[in-house]
Amino acid sequence: MTRLPLFHSHAKRREAGGRTETIHLPCRLIALDLDGTLMALDLKFSPRVRHAVAVAQERGIAVTLATGRSPLSTCPFAAELDIRVPLICYQGGLIAQRDGRLLHRATLESHLAAQVIDLAQSHGWHVTLYQDGAFYLPELRHPLSFYEGFLNPSVHQVADLRSLLDHDPDKMIIIAQGNGDEILAGLREHFDGQMQIVRSHELFIEVNPLGVDKGSGLAWLSNYLSVPQAQVMAVGDQDNDAPMIAWAGLGVAMGNGSPACKAAADWIAPPLEEDGAAVAIERFALNSPFTK
């Protein structure tokens, strides 16, 4: 059996006299954000990222993707990296196998979704909705390729999103147009304590079911795989990644990460353009420098 490398977890115990000692454990699960962490706007993985993920899996470490994307949008990237364990999608609201089999799902209550639609329309915000694997919007404000590439391959234009609310949607996204701070503040003012509201990108303000975030999703998957929290590593770059970075035994923020993401992290990796995610995997899970 392959011996797992020592994982330099930041889980600590307090010794007598105030001394703190770091516990070294083997890494058994790595959760990786996609956009801004593993790939840039070109949606491509670098050779170094591919290599680090492949070696980790060869050594018996489970690697998953933790993203706000839908399963339909996530699975092609998972296939490229040959991810073998369930995927964390919709910010932790849905966990599924690569073959599409659902393991866990939380949905946004329809009456709350209707209120978000009303608020968005009153302000002229670009509101969109995910339901049953498809992506819906009332109008196109960007080229179709924008929605297909960054949000979901299955895009449907529906004049009134309320017509879809005969059952609960998975989540909603309001696409900012230079007004992201205003949207975030407005949603939180009206719906604080009723739903999870988070910024996942400069352009994307997400509305998820209350209690759903990448931290809760990673905790669910860790339990499903019987991996202790202390042996989990998470890497991300945005505010929506902060919960899983804070929850993991070792949380890593990208050098290009948001302030909230970095504040939650145990270690700051180099930025995306310097393959920061691969560097983190090599350093903390593989304990070896990258070699071609």
Describe each region flagged by the PLM.
Residues 60-64, 83-85, 170-172, 230-232, ...:
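Short active-site oxyanion
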Residues 42-144:
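Active-site phosphate-binding/coordination module
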Residues 119, 123-247, 256:
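Conserved acidic, metal-coordinating active-site core of Asp-based
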Residues 84-91, 105-106, 197, 251-255, ...:
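Short hydrophobic/aromatic-enriched beta-strand-loop microsegments
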Residues 1-32, 58, 227:
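Non-catalytic pre-domain segments flanking phosphatase-related domains
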Residues 21-29, 46, 206-292:
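Mg2+-dependent phosphoryl-transfer enzymes with acidic/Ser/Thr/Gly-rich catalytic loops
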Residues 81-83, 90-91, 98, 190-193, ...:
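Short, structured coil segments at secondary-structure junctions
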